[in-house]
Amino acid sequence: MAGERERGGRERSRDREERDSEFVDKLVHINRVAKVVKGGKRFGFAALVVIGDQKGRVGFGHGKAREVPEAIRKATESAKRNLTRVPLREGRTLHHDIAGRHGAGRVYLRAAPAGTGIIAGGPMRAVFETLGIQDVVAKSVGSSNPYNMVRATFDALKHQDSPRSVSARRNIKVSTLQSRRVGGDAEAVAE
């Protein structure tokens, strides 16, 4: 019965909810906006939402509407359409240190040992929690605008490479990369 469609090609709402339940969403920011019209001001709301499966897929979306719940719904739908996959080391942290920027906002992300936790501020924390990262140290420099911070974080995560993709690009074995990582700089210079 699961996955059946009713007349008209619509899925049953229960099945749709089961499919959507794999995602965790976090509301990052709500902004009240005003449009000046002839009769006065018309108020609306803008929402920024981050959504992820806590297994390496994450996306963010922006939605605007006259009511808060509608703006959040639109932002969530937008985030689902913009999911990206990020490779994680041991399913808990980043493979290497990275930096990202958007506008005047810069973020620096560092891989951390097990047990460190998420050391990051506001919007970046929401991205890491929905992504499934458990150990990371992050620093934001410059603009503290939530939109810029989220976009800068996604810019940094876009440049995240797994050892497998690096080894394929450089035509070397993954074990060679791993030995250089564990051994440190002294052994890498000796080779």
UniProtKB/Swiss-Prot annotation:
Domain writeup: The N-terminal domain interacts with the head of the 30S subunit; the C-terminal domain interacts with the body and contacts protein S4. The interaction surface between S4 and S5 is involved in control of translational fidelity.
GO CC term, one of those recorded: small ribosomal subunit
Subunit structure: Part of the 30S ribosomal subunit. Contacts proteins S4 and S8.
Name this polypeptide is given: Small ribosomal subunit protein uS5
Region (Disordered): 1-20
Lineage start: Bacteria, Pseudomonadati, Pseudomonadota, Alphaproteobacteria, Hyphomicrobiales
HAMAP family reported in the protein's UniProt record: Ribosomal_uS5_B
Recorded family membership: Belongs to the universal ribosomal protein uS5 family.
GO biological process, one term: translation
Keywords, alphabetical: Ribonucleoprotein, Ribosomal protein, RNA-binding, rRNA-binding
Gene3D superfamilies per the UniProt record, alphabetical: 3.30.160.20, 3.30.230.10
Gene Ontology MF terms: rRNA binding; structural constituent of ribosome
Organism: Nitrobacter winogradskyi (strain ATCC 25391 / DSM 10237 / CIP 104748 / NCIMB 11846 / Nb-255)
Annotated InterPro entries: Ribosomal_Su5_D2-typ_SF (IPR020568), Ribosomal_uS5 (IPR000851), Ribosomal_uS5_bac-type (IPR005712), Ribosomal_uS5_C (IPR005324), Ribosomal_uS5_N (IPR013810), Ribosomal_uS5_N_CS (IPR018192), Ribsml_uS5_D2-typ_fold_subgr (IPR014721)
Sequence ranges assigned to domain S5 DRBM in this UniProt record: 23-86
Function summary: With S4 and S12 plays an important role in translational accuracy.
Pfam families assigned to the protein according to its UniProt record, in alphabetical order: Ribosomal_S5, Ribosomal_S5_C
